A protein has these predicted regions:
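C-terminal structural segments of small proteins and small subunits
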Residues: 44-73
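Amphipathic, hydrophobic secondary-structure cores in small proteins
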Residues: 17-49
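A generic structural signal for short beta-strands and their flanking turns/coil linkers
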Residues: 1, 10-12, 29-31, 40-42, ...
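Generic low-complexity, intrinsically disordered sequence content enriched
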Residues: 11, 16, 35, 51, ...
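Structured beta-strand/loop patches that form or line metal/cofactor-binding pockets in enzymes
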Residues: 2-3, 7-26
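Intrinsic disorder/low-complexity segments
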Residues: 12, 38, 70-73
Length: 73
């Protein structure tokens, strides 16, 4: 997973997979989901992040991911 905070375009993007984006859908105002050819989510974009989040919270963003052992269980 890759996370990109673009202050110039005021967007936060979570790239979950490197699969090709085939379709994008704004599922809620300012929330766009990217899908691959099979309909799986490959990315999530949050627009207008400066309005929705405190910048200090985004700068110190921490991601908790399960270990492979926990996912396989």
């Amino acid at each position: 997973m890759k996370i990109k905070l673009d202050l110039e375009s005021d967007a936060l993007y979570f790239r979950i997979s490197e699969d090709t984006i085939e379709e994008s859908e704004e599922i809620s105002k300012g929330l766009v989901v990217d899908y691959d050819a099979s309909g799986k989510v490959v990315g999530i974009e949050i627009l207008n992040v400066k309005e929705k989040f405190k910048m200090e919270d985004l700068i110190g963003l921490k991601i908790e991911m399960p270990t492979i052992a926990n996912v396989a269980a």
